[in-house]
Design a protein with these regions (language model features):
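Short, well-structured N-terminal submotif of metal-dependent ribonuclease cores
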Residues: 1-38, 48-61
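Acidic, PIN/NYN-like endoribonuclease modules and their adjacent C-terminal/linker elements
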Residues: 2-4, 25, 101-130
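Histidine- and aromatic-rich ligand-binding microenvironments
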Residues: 7-8, 38-39, 89-90, 125-130
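A generic structural signal for short hydrophobic patches within well-formed alpha-helices
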Residues: 12-13, 43, 73, 117
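A general structural signal for well-ordered alpha-helical segments in protein cores
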Residues: 22-23, 43, 53-56, 73-76, ...
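Short, hinge-like loop/turn segments at secondary-structure boundaries
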Residues: 53-57, 83, 126-128
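Structural recognition of alpha->loop->beta junctions
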Residues: 59-64, 122
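Active-site neighborhoods of divalent-metal-dependent phosphate/nucleic-acid chemistry enzymes
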Residues: 65-114
């Protein structure tokens, strides 16, 4: 696989809402054979209020949704401790970062909060603000 494009909650929300920039990035990634992914927890965090359930289901059928396993939460907990961050605020980002760190390279994360994810993901992951 030629890499991974990971969506945080804002990236996924923008995909649900047909944001042109995010749709274009996801389409380009898919055309190049890049795996588009997110975490199961991110799907809960993403904005559902104005999105038809059928659209959410359709989008998620085309995205690799990673289960948040004990192994991932263990790695996320290490990231939180390492960076002195509290799980109450950063748990979902830490889980996504744990997934990003093990995903096929190169890895890009689309996020609205690049500072937190840049810290958690480390230098091998490109973090892009959307």
């Amino acid at each position: 696989m030629p890499g991974t494009l990971l969506l945080d909650s804002e990236g996924l929300s923008k995909l649900y809402r047909k944001d042109r920039t995010v749709v274009a990035l996801v389409q380009a990634a898919a055309e190049e054979g890049v795996r588009v992914a997110t975490s199961a927890m991110t799907t809960l965090e993403a904005d559902y209020e104005r999105i038809h359930p059928a659209r959410i289901k359709w989008i998620l059928s085309r995205v690799d949704v990673h289960d948040v396993t004990k192994e991932i939460t263990d790695r996320a907990a290490v990231l939180l401790r390492t960076h002195h961050l509290h799980g109450h605020k950063y748990a979902i980002d830490a889980a996504l970062a744990a997934i990003a760190r093990d995903a096929p390279q190169p890895v890009t994360v689309l996020t609205s909060d690049p500072d937190d994810l840049t810290l958690l993901c480390g230098p091998s992951v490109e973090v892009v603000k959307v």
